């Protein structure tokens, strides 16, 4: 895991696989288990270090889903009280802001 170079919040990190492959659906069962285990370990450290009120976990698969790096990585983003006006919605609000994307 590494800290994101363009963090959304303090502690925003990336869980990155050793083996190179493009996206989550190419991961083996063992790799998915390793990602899950590391995510929990990092979360436990962040609970102590940053004391967040919650977390967002994100995986973008494909260019039109926002994937900009062609290597699987999972965003683990600590969330804090008051970090946004209204944290509800997440991707559920995506349909309200869809625009044509030609990347």
Positions of predicted regions on the chain:
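HIT superfamily nucleotide-processing domains
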Residues: 1-103
